[in-house]
Amino acid sequence: MPTKLYWAEGPWRGRLAMASRPRGDDWLEDEMASWRREGIDTVFSLLTSEEAKDLGLEDEAKHVKARGMQFVSFPIPDRDVPDSDAKVAMALERLDADLSAGRNVVIHCRQGVGRSGLISAALLVMKGFTPEAAIKSLSASRGASVPETAGQRRWLDHYAAILGGTKLAPSHTVR
């Protein structure tokens, strides 16, 4: 059975999905074919290279591209948060541009709850949602509470404060 996509509501022409990692190794080609049939245009992976290797997903980018989709890797360690506000801003702008252009995007991590929920919530906050509203909407879509950790929730509040113009030191990292 293919990895389930959890579709989220958002203000874009394209659609946003969260998912756990696709099945790897011999199943990877079938997984990417399934995601393409579901209408996915961009696969946004939050797995680290070590996780991808352990899960049989070293060739994920190759299989994604072979199906005519775009692949973006933005590694965040499991149960953690982005390590750079500038890098996450660029990643979120890329996701927002794809979604605004009508492209369908899936964001995945290992279980599709913590990191996927965090980045999806940050996208909604970027579009004007409060952190609470983003979490409520995405948790309902996912059928599980997102994001996974208190540190991820603190980071989402930190990101919302940055967008709201709150002055923070550029090197400030919330964990």
Where are these regions (language model features)?
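Short cysteine clusters
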Residues: 109
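Ser/Thr-glycine-rich phosphate-binding loops at phosphate-binding pockets of nucleotides
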Residues: 116
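Conserved G/P- and acidic residue-centered "switch" motifs that form tight phosphate/ATP-binding loops
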Residues: 112
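Cys-dependent protein tyrosine phosphatase-like superfamily
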Residues: 1-106, 119-175
